[in-house]
Amino acid sequence: MNTFGHFLRVTTWGESHGRAVGCVIDGFPAGLEVDEEFIQREMERRRPGKKYTTQRKEVDRVEILSGVFEGLTTATPISMVVWNVDADSSAYESLKTVFRPGHADYTYWAKFGVRDWRGGGRASARETAARVAAGAMAKLLLRRYDVKVMGYAKEIAGVSCEVDDAEKAFERAERSPLRMPDERAEKEAEQRLKEAMSEGDSVGGVVEVVAKNVPAGLGEPVFGKLDAYLAYAVMGIPAVKGVEIGAGFEAARKRGSENNDPIVLKDGRIRFATNNAGGILGGISNGEDIVLRAAIKPTPSISKKQRTVDYEKMEEAEISVKGRHDPCIVPRAVPVVEAMVALVLADCMLMQGLIPRSLL
Amino acid sequence: MNTFGHFLRVTTWGESHGRAVGCVIDGFPAGLEVDEEFIQREMERRRPGKKYTTQRKEVDRVEILSGVFEGLTTATPISMVVWNVDADSSAYESLKTVFRPGHADYTYWAKFGVRDWRGGGRASARETAARVAAGAMAKLLLRRYDVKVMGYAKEIAGVSCEVDDAEKAFERAERSPLRMPDERAEKEAEQRLKEAMSEGDSVGGVVEVVAKNVPAGLGEPVFGKLDAYLAYAVMGIPAVKGVEIGAGFEAARKRGSENNDPIVLKDGRIRFATNNAGGILGGISNGEDIVLRAAIKPTPSISKKQRTVDYEKMEEAEISVKGRHDPCIVPRAVPVVEAMVALVLADCMLMQGLIPRSLL
Amino acid sequence: MNTFGHFLRVTTWGESHGRAVGCVIDGFPAGLEVDEEFIQREMERRRPGKKYTTQRKEVDRVEILSGVFEGLTTATPISMVVWNVDADSSAYESLKTVFRPGHADYTYWAKFGVRDWRGGGRASARETAARVAAGAMAKLLLRRYDVKVMGYAKEIAGVSCEVDDAEKAFERAERSPLRMPDERAEKEAEQRLKEAMSEGDSVGGVVEVVAKNVPAGLGEPVFGKLDAYLAYAVMGIPAVKGVEIGAGFEAARKRGSENNDPIVLKDGRIRFATNNAGGILGGISNGEDIVLRAAIKPTPSISKKQRTVDYEKMEEAEISVKGRHDPCIVPRAVPVVEAMVALVLADCMLMQGLIPRSLL
Amino acid sequence: MNTFGHFLRVTTWGESHGRAVGCVIDGFPAGLEVDEEFIQREMERRRPGKKYTTQRKEVDRVEILSGVFEGLTTATPISMVVWNVDADSSAYESLKTVFRPGHADYTYWAKFGVRDWRGGGRASARETAARVAAGAMAKLLLRRYDVKVMGYAKEIAGVSCEVDDAEKAFERAERSPLRMPDERAEKEAEQRLKEAMSEGDSVGGVVEVVAKNVPAGLGEPVFGKLDAYLAYAVMGIPAVKGVEIGAGFEAARKRGSENNDPIVLKDGRIRFATNNAGGILGGISNGEDIVLRAAIKPTPSISKKQRTVDYEKMEEAEISVKGRHDPCIVPRAVPVVEAMVALVLADCMLMQGLIPRSLL
């Protein structure tokens, strides 16, 4: 279950404080030129060590060990490694026998009877570095078909952004430390974030991802629907607690006549006048933008005191999680959600035969 | 992609106006006594022909064709059939060449170049009868392990119910035509629904499902997380546009200190003082109730006039969808969401070894 | 595990003496005209009730319950049912508590703790009726791409046929009660079969299947190789104990210089001068005929006395299996092996993009 | 399709002359002590650079990058890397545009339009180093349940060994340069091999693997039968052209009364008096030894002149494959077949619940 995808399959491996994290991409078509700089730029977007993020210093350089020959993919598995450089387990020594609230410490222990307590081990968000590397490959592939996947923080600490145009929002957000597309909202969110930080607390938010130029016909009813697949992909990202498509939960409050997107002809092609459906009808893409939002919970690692249990002594205890943590994971979650969406879309295009097995 | 599940796999088949719908359940353990009455009661909960639902008359009797011998499951595939009795395609004749807005008509046509236009064909919610039949088998299995899956309409037409206790809410909702647990909310929702109906319109809502006595340890990180699997299962139900777990989108507005569930000892066992996590941490169940909500869009079939395209003439057209439709699909969606949750939980318990291959 | 295939997936269900056997085909492309007569002819080739076969009378009429609309496939699941008409469990009553040697009686009991003792239940070769029905659909699809799958009994009771041309061999074999392409061998095999029958015994043989006009490029290294996939498909047929490709076990006795097929140009196309490889190199089809042989063990049901164990009394016992059994299953196994080969080839062509999702 | 297994899944990656080969093992239970020395000994058994093998010098040291913490497996993915040290592509430069007969050169090119021509790239038997590493982990797991997987060369160059006792045969073979258990046969085979070598030619043979103490109940009918799964696993090994179980192709020549294994009581337990079935009935293990044979073709790389095609000039050509090649791959294939058998058995034991998710 560390493998994602049907036709294009990504297997990730590695722990937060182990030697490395990495992935193997299988089913990638032959003949794509690998733009390593692009991959590195994607890694950079998720990388820690910036404002409002953990101060762990990781260069996150991706090494490709297989599957590429003379600059081209060969349709054989692409093995990518990101070495862990700045893992520091000392802060975790004292947490060895207590479960951090809001983390997977207890559940891993309950499931497997053993856990790597250093920095969350496998459950650490560090694993998502491998997803971003794989997602970068998917984006390179989609780029060739003019499909763009763009994300930003739609909301942080309860402050929501107005977004008219996803492309502009994306560009604006890329220059924002909170990855928010709306300056006014950003200011307010920043204020709330600082307040939380000053109290040793954290905040959450909502990531929105829009995919443009997605062809109609993607998705496999009745269980492998495009929206079901996206929900699976995105809900499996650490800290995500909700996923919605198009109008999402708001659709539940609308009338049918409001929510149904009128079908029209534009330039002789069948299109939709509105996009409450978020680009998906009956689990199949309809040619409009795919619009998806993910609810990101506040970072569970906080220095504020919390109640927990010490399982060696089997007694209640107090905990204050030190170490280097993101007070808000939302900005760094954006490229991860994008990566998963890109992987889903590339996989569906391959399944639908819209991307061939070989580009040559 | 008409198969759902890993260890416990359900394949559904059939079209709304074809001869039957049905399913094959594979991987079901040997030795379970099959309570056919229970299965039939579950079918009855989803069955059309009642107040505020389509008036199509279907007895929805399940026939078991294989996999059961002398009343016990044998671990071989269980084939179940529900014959279509009251399909009436006449209302659809006039819609043959126009796409119904909010339906899968356009996308099936775009994907496959052909579609069964009678009542939505495969994309019809009639397919969910097969899911409920399979889900009933999963519930029978879970019942043996004291796991209960209970759902109700949390919200209809924007009117939300107060719920303290899921078990009582479930019981109350079972006696409600809107399957709402809160009488006051029900009255108001009923009023809004009637208004919509009088205008040839429809409404949506939110289904909440709670699973009790779920053991800790279910779910397969990092991609096959329990919440990801549930999101996949539930987002794939027709009309669902959003899924959230525990505090869900509200979690995005909380502080870490509010959202983290304190870990405590109750009767010497590790438990959680609150349940914002909805019973899942790091993608693995933590022993608390699983709490999930699904946003259900308003029924797309409305008699109100809508804009669409006639694809034979390739020109814009108006459409008014006649036929027998649910003005609000939420009450009938409840057992479907429950069925998918039950299938996920049974599958995870099998994968985790908590349910053996043979109960004998 | 009652599902076969990756892209084109077949799920079979049903027991020998249950109500029916059937299958659900998922992933079948849209737009194929369904030739029901062809399907029925394929069923006829496997049907019991002929010379040298069990005298069980089954018309084996296939009913299609879904996935076909106005004569065309719609890319939705195709559900097919074959009702059991002439099941007679009385002969099995006395065998309820003894394991038949050479059968799956003991292993099903050991695995599941319960078994349907009537006619072998799920382990009966009757299940292969569903495979032949599904295989017929695959053949219809392949026919459109001029791919032909032809089988015959290469050997029965140790008597082997000379085969020069697979197409002629197939045609000759279709008129032979033993499905043997070589008259001289057939006479001798018939003699040996009659001898065995007169002693209440049975014989085995070898089925050879040749697939013509298979495009190069099918198969997925390194684990999903075409030969591995074929071996999986064919070894899973009841009574098969060995599978070989091309020169097979004989290749193990050759020199490299003899076994390597020289690569040549024929009419400007790259071809192979010989076909020891059986059309597969490195797990990928090379454009030559696929040649596969399966070893079929002698029918385990024999009236000759055998030693066994009565597991109720837990003591040794003697058994003489009465009932209506094939003294040699090889002729009826031929269409089953063909069906599995056809399913594999159709699946691989879909995966490789050589057959599109929609033929329209 | 570079992933093998259902519950225990192995993904291999890497090319012969790339930077490394490796694998990721997913689904491995928690709590197993990792005996790195054992893994290394297994690598040593497959390692090149010995008598009658290629003279490529590879230390084949396995590095474990994840999934192990404080010496114990953690149920998270185990990433293993074997760096390529002595790859020398110079001998392949001249073969860039010609297909080597008997190799996958043509088929990879036909399938993907591009190929890594250095040493066979992904199709090289070097990939099996990763399989042996993964297989070693499976063996460690099986060892805990007393299941032993032992292989040897049953036949080389047409010379067959007598084997009475698999355990003794295995031990004897481990000391033999040809990995043959029978000294007389070994001498003769060695003679024939030398003759072939002197003519720039190669020979093939048959590997036999026996698994002892395999519990009854493994295998998933009707498609995922244990024998089908083994056939899939073993036929997918480079150079394998045939697989048989128990009596295999010989069973096809026997009478039912000879081939059926009598069922008897030994020490109060149900057992089989003979083992023509090779430990598998109806696709499920019966508690007897699993016996499997694989036909290995002669090494296709020979210095003897062969006919081929130069695809740049698109004209016929002659080829003499220089470089460092095994004149007979059989001895080195033995641990690879064992590895695949071990992976299958461990996977089936996990699926059957005979190995738990955590050993703690």
Swiss-Prot record, chains A, B, C, D:
Name the reaction it catalyses.
5-O-(1-carboxyvinyl)-3-phosphoshikimate = chorismate + phosphate
> Does the record's keyword annotation contain ATP-binding?
no
Looking up Pfam families in the UniProt record yields:
Chorismate_synt
CC cofactor note: Reduced FMN (FMNH(2)).
The domain of life is Archaea
Keyword Flavoprotein assigned to the entry: answer is: yes
Return the SUPFAM superfamilies for the record: Chorismate synthase, AroC
Q: Name one GO molecular function term.
A: FMN binding
Q: Which cofactor does it need?
A: FMNH2
- Residues given in the record as NADP(+) binding sites: 46
**GO-annotated cellular components:** cytosol
Pathway the protein takes part in: Metabolic intermediate biosynthesis; chorismate biosynthesis; chorismate from D-erythrose 4-phosphate and phosphoenolpyruvate: step 7/7
What keywords are annotated for this sequence in UniProt?
Amino-acid biosynthesis, Aromatic amino acid biosynthesis, FAD, Flavoprotein, FMN, Lyase, NADP
Q: What EC number(s) are associated with this protein in UniProt?
A: 4.2.3.5
> What does the UniProt record say this protein does?
This reaction introduces a second double bond into the aromatic ring system.
Q: Which family does the similarity line name?
A: Belongs to the chorismate synthase family.
Give the HAMAP family listed for this entry: Chorismate_synth
Q: What name has this protein been given in UniProt?
A: Chorismate synthase
Identify the coding gene: aroC
